[in-house]
UniProtKB/Swiss-Prot annotation:
Domain F-box: 1-49
A Pfam family: LRR_At5g56370
SMART domains: FBD
CDD domains documented for this protein: F-box_AtFBL13-like (cd22160)
Keywords: Leucine-rich repeat, Repeat
Coiled coil: none
Residue stretches of each LRR repeat: 103-125, 128-151, 152-174, 203-218, 219-242, 249-272, 288-314, 315-339, 344-369, 403-414, 415-437, 450-474, 503-518, 519-541, 584-594
Natural source organism: Arabidopsis thaliana
Name assigned to this protein: F-box/LRR-repeat protein At3g58980
């Protein structure tokens, strides 16, 4: 103890930050010097998904045991599996105790039922600088914000699956009004249509705003006001309402848009010319006139700018434009692009995040929607970047138009999963309007390296073999310190890959197949000698040729068997989990699911 006591105060405080609330409380009685130092607790954390974390009651008791003179800077409470009505009172007592101890950063990552009510003291805390409410698993309802709500120090507010339902006055608007210095507001998994609110997002101090809608089925809300005169960053992924009556975005510098037009207030996918569009983004689009950086993040957004092109203002400050073509249908038209480019007199960089647009049936022609690329003739573009360029005849033909019509072009960056070989020389020989234009090609797989990546989460991702090697395995090989990988909503049958998961460093692996498919993998290999945790929910393939799970401690299995796995009528094969089952021989905890 003497050696530790001789350390500087800063180091001792850092050591304390790794203690639980109860341990910190017990340690505070060791000496007078330690008691004084422990009046500041750097961080408290509870996560019911972490093994050996202890119970929520133990954590609450530890917090309540802290001296009343102590100060807690940060606390994260993550209660998803264990958070049920019997814990509501304990949880709220813990929150109130933290609020009395000068909490600066509070994260309440919880999924609670309709009967849960957040302590009203949260809305009158004078010390909170950052507040995070809700969870990806469901969040909770805020049905009352007190009249005396006052959060004078709050700069960052994150809401996840939070719904506001104050019938007397708009609780959401009241909350924003209580935040005198709010700089950043993030609303994830938002459902306007389930809120009871005024439709006003108003803050004179707000600088960054992120909104993402969770489902787009029916949206009956009619209007949203954006009264945020100091906003510099906007990320909006949402269904477009009937109107944006007030749009005050004069300070906006960067915007990312994923807008979906509604047909009769319902999600209709891509809009047809004969559809009755209930959405109107006119004022929103016009309100973007001062932006410098813009990202149109989906073909749905392309449609919004196309159908309402008359609202597109002159983007006098816009110098960097990104269009994200994440649709698998290359033929989806780009009518919006000429309208936008013509309104960008100072555009310097265009990033096409995805493939170029062309008609696959007529690859050497130009789609009518691009008007022969004539809009490029007056464009001052200097840098063109294409993130998914395969060098097909159709893509080469489209690229020619950019090279031949952009007289100020200085650099073309082409990112590809394909090794060009001799085609690269042909690419460099293409004629250009600018003598200063250089073309650089980047082989994404060849240069793949993620030296610091420890956690990799893939959700609904597919891998295709475009360069003669397994893209998925190439990705794993590029992660020399990978510890955890989570793969959700998989569709193995649509992948082009080797059927192998190989990593020498991987410790935790979760695999969750989306559908019980009629056909499945012939084989799957686990080459993961350091793996200690496996959560495996998938169909059993024809075989497991290699299973290296010698370090496995815990396994959760939900295995499906297909009795008619055939590639064709003459080549049947069956599911065989033999080697997988044998490979589990060292596990200590085994859970089998139906």
């Amino acid at each position: 103890m003497d050696r530790i006591s001789n350390l500087p105060n800063e180091i001792i405080c850092h050591i304390v930050s790794f203690l639980s609330a109860k341990e910190a409380a017990f340690a505070s009685i060791l000496s007078k010097r330690w008691r004084n130092l422990f009046t500041i607790v750097i961080k408290l954390q509870f996560d019911d998904s972490v093994k050996n974390e202890g119970s929520l009651k133990d954590f609450v008791d530890g917090v309540l045991a802290l001296p009343t003179s102590s100060r807690v800077r940060s606390c994260s409470l993550e209660c998803r599996r264990e958070f049920d009505p019997t814990h509501y009172d304990d949880f709220n007592r813990c929150i109130c105790a933290l609020l009395k101890r000068g909490i600066l950063d509070l994260k309440l990552d919880i999924c609670a039922g309709r009967r849960y009510s957040l302590p009203l003291e949260v809305f009158t805390c004078k010390t909170l600088v950052k507040l995070e409410l809700g969870s990806d698993f469901g969040g909770f309802v805020v049905d009352l914000v007190p009249e005396d709500a006052f959060l004078p120090a709050l700069e960052t507010l994150l809401l996840n699956y939070i719904r506001f339902k104050d019938l007397r006055r708009c609780a959401f608007e009241k909350l924003l009004s209580a935040c005198l210095v709010l700089k950043e507001l993030v609303i994830h998994n938002m459902e306007w249509e389930r809120w009871k609110w005024s439709g006003n997002i108003s803050s004179p101090t707000l600088e960054r705003l992120t909104i993402s809608h969770v489902d787009l089925y029916e949206c009956e809300f009619t209007r949203i006001n954006l009264d945020t005169p100091n906003l510099t960053y906007l990320e909006l992924s949402d269904a477009v309402p009937d109107d944006y009556p007030i749009v005050n975005l004069d300070s906006l510098v960067e915007v990312k848009l994923d807008l979906t037009l509604m047909v009769d207030h319902k999600y209709h996918g891509y809009v047809d010319d004969n559809d009755t569009i209930s959405s109107n983004p006119t004022n929103l689009i016009n309100g973007l006139r001062n932006v410098e950086i813009m990202n149109l993040q989906s073909p749905n957004t392309f449609q919004a700018f196309s159908y309402f092109h008359e609202a597109i203002p002159v983007f006098k400050n816009l110098y960097h434009l990104t269009i994200t073509n994440n649709d698998t249908v290359i033929g989806f038209c780009w009518e919006f692009l000429p309208f936008v480019i013509k309104k960008c007199p100072n555009l310097k960089t265009l990033v096409i995040d995805g493939p170029l647009h062309y008609n696959e049936d007529r690859p050497k022609s130009v789609c009518h929607c691009l008007s022969g690329y004539s809009f490029l003739l007056s464009c001052p573009l200097e840098v063109l970047q294409i993130t998914d360029y395969s060098g097909t005849p159709g893509e080469v033909e489209q690229l020619k138009h950019f090279l031949e019509k952009l007289s100020g072009l200085k650099l073309v960056k082409l990112h590809s999963l394909t090794r060009f070989g001799s085609d690269k020389k042909k690419l460099l020989m293409l004629p250009r309007a600018s003598s200063k234009c250089k073309i650089k090609h980047y082989d994404s797989l060849e240069n793949a390296l993620l030296p610091s990546l420890k956690t990799l989460i893939l959700d609904s991702v597919k891998f295709y073999d475009r360069c003669g090697c397994c893209a998925f395995q190439k990705l794993l090989s590029a992660c020399p310190v990978l510890v955890e990988s989570v793969m959700r909503n998989l569709e193995w049958e649509d992948w082009e890959w080797s059927g192998c998961a190989s990593s020498q460093t991987l410790e935790r692996l979760t695999i969750d197949h989306r559908y019980w498919a009629e056909h499945n993998l012939e084989s799957f290999t686990f080459d993961t000698p350091s793996l200690t945790y496996l959560d495996y929910n998938a169909h059993v393939p024809g075989s497991y040729p290699t299973v290296n799970l010698d370090s496995l401690v815990e396994a959760k299995l939900n295995l499906g068997f297909t009795t008619d796995l055939v590639e064709d009528d003459d080549d049947p094969f069956t599911s065989d989990p033999t080697n997988l089952i044998k490979g589990l021989r060292n596990v200590e905890i085994l859970r089998l699911w139906m």
